[in-house]
Amino acid sequence: VPWFTPQNQNLSKVAVTNMFEWLTKHPAHSVISGVTTVNEPQTDNGNTTRVSILRDFYRWSIQQGDKYNLPVILHHGFVPEPYRYWDDFMSEQDPSMVIFDDHPYPAWYQNPNPTNETVIIQNICDLGQQGEDFPVPVVMGEWSGVNNVNQSELTTDYLNTQVSTYGWSGGSMFFNYRVNTTQNPVVGPPANIGVEYSLLDMLPQGNAVGQFPIYNGSTSVRAFTNSLRPSCGRAPSYDLTT
């Protein structure tokens, strides 16, 4: 879909406006933490024309969020070095109303995909540090256990490290709840990869894929994530009085 055309920009604005109107009237309005106005816009690796259009759309999105008193969630658009690229724009925004969205795959979609655990963990730590230092909260809006090693012990460490580190800023959302195995993988990944996207398959104790960390509510979330052998360090402390 040519999202960057004027016609589709206008259609998107109509859809987003209607979404805000609907959300503000919804009975569960109070639990909404943020609104994504466009998911994973493809800027063609930072094409200047596309990024300019995207920035304008994000400025408009922020105005709508302010109007309806709902924070907006803005994806980086796959530009090179996204945290550096968007730092100036995000520095101008209200961090209580704008959330930066990243969909990290520190052991997948790389060239080449890393197979050394030290490299994989360091990739996660780098993401955590960038999120901690960013001018607005960063949500890891899509992540998974997918990796190129496919060993349960490494996958468990990989999951634990991501859960603990991605909470340093705006939190995270795992992708996704369940992936069904297909006998005809035309578009989807092979079974040994697809299962690492599947939370349901990684929750059972002793499963062969990797153990997803289970929070039982007996401690604070911070204490829980700090208990997961956090290879990147413990969650930072913030002074909320300033």
Give the positions of each predicted feature.
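Substrate-binding cleft of extracellular glycoside hydrolase catalytic domains
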Residues: 1-18
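Alpha-helix initiation/capping motif
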Residues: 5, 115-116, 148, 222, ...
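Extracellular glycoside hydrolase catalytic/binding regions
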Residues: 14, 21-27, 34, 38-168
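Substrate-binding cleft of secreted/luminal carbohydrate-active enzymes
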Residues: 131-223, 227-230
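Non-catalytic C-terminal accessory domains or segments of carbohydrate-active enzymes
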Residues: 225-242
